[in-house]
């Protein structure tokens, strides 16, 4: 029996964890980037009977007024991800919040984790997918897993998690105490198979 799988990507978290796990300094900014569709297919392929029905990418968006170069790069990357996605990839972005002393302090995402958590819970609770795979190491998202377990109890759980797994390093995967949630631990070979090394700052 096929299972509809939707993958939820906390994109900046996925990116930075990939860099930490698999990219030796000095690494270019493109190292750590992933192709959402390729990653979604990889994960859905590890669910018994899994059929990928969506990849939802949540990320911050640089301000055009404050950082036009990064804003343009983000737009190019988003367009390519959606264009490659065959109708399966959706990118949801919110403008970054800039501190008064930017760029000495970096801009930060605002509201991305909340948007991801709400969509994750609602889509699974409404049975819009059979399996929702959450790829993030942000512990602020643990309550979303807890909510899914309460709203759609069962074994196996309707929610699963994913994380990068570097040799000899404990993976930063999310968990809920006392609950059995399947973990997809992705190796460096997995990362290389879905990596996107495009330099989106280039206009050519």
Which residues fall in each region the model found?
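Domain-level signal for Mg2+-assisted phosphodiester chemistry and nucleotide/NA-binding surfaces
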Residues: 1-107
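Nuclease catalytic cores that cleave nucleic-acid phosphodiester bonds
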Residues: 88-204
């Amino acid at each position: 029996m096929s299972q509809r799988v939707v993958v939820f990507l906390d994109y900046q978290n996925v990116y930075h964890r990939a860099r930490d796990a698999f990219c030796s300094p000095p690494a270019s900014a493109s190292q750590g980037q992933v192709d959402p569709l390729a990653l979604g297919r990889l994960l859905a392929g590890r669910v018994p009977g899994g059929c990928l029905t969506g990849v939802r990418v949540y990320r911050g968006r640089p301000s055009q007024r404050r950082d036009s170069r990064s804003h343009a790069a983000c737009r190019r990357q988003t367009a390519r991800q959606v264009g490659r996605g065959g109708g399966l990839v959706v990118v949801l972005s919110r403008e970054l919040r800039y501190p008064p002393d930017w760029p000495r302090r970096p801009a930060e995402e605002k509201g991305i984790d909340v948007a991801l958590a709400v969509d994750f819970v609602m889509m699974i609770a409404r049975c819009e997918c059979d399996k929702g795979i959450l790829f993030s190491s942000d512990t602020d998202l643990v309550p979303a897993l807890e909510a899914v377990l309460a709203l759609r109890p069962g074994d196996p759980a309707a929610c699963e998690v994913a994380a990068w797994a570097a040799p000899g390093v404990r993976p930063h995967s999310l968990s809920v105490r006392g609950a059995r949630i399947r973990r997809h631990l992705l190796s460096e070979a997995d990362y290389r198979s879905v990596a996107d090394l495009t330099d989106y700052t280039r206009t050519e």
